[in-house]
Swiss-Prot record:
Biological processes, Gene Ontology terms: translation
Coiled-coil regions listed: none
SS bonds (residue pairs): none
Keywords: Ribonucleoprotein, Ribosomal protein
Organism: Koribacter versatilis (strain Ellin345)
Protein's name according to its UniProt entry: Large ribosomal subunit protein bL33
GO MF annotation: an example: structural constituent of ribosome
Record GO cellular component, one term: ribonucleoprotein complex
KW Ribonucleoprotein (keyword) present: yes
Entries under NCBIfam families matching the protein: PRK00504.1, PRK00595.1, rpmG_bact
Length: 50
């Protein structure tokens, strides 16, 4: 199965807030989204971590 579960980590507080799936065959780079962080209480950049 090519899809793998990944975690998204806040760029400011380093808290792992979100989890999602990713197809590693078609998306080789790291994902980055602008998401709401409950700890920071604002929209921040969330990057993929293992």
């Amino acid at each position: 199965m090519p899809r793998e579960i990944i975690q998204l980590q806040c760029g400011d507080c380093k808290d792992k807030n979100y989890s999602t799936t990713k197809n590693k065959k078609t998306t080789t780079g790291r994902l980055e989204f602008s998401k709401f962080c409950r700890k920071c209480r604002k929209h921040t950049s969330h990057k993929e971590v293992k």
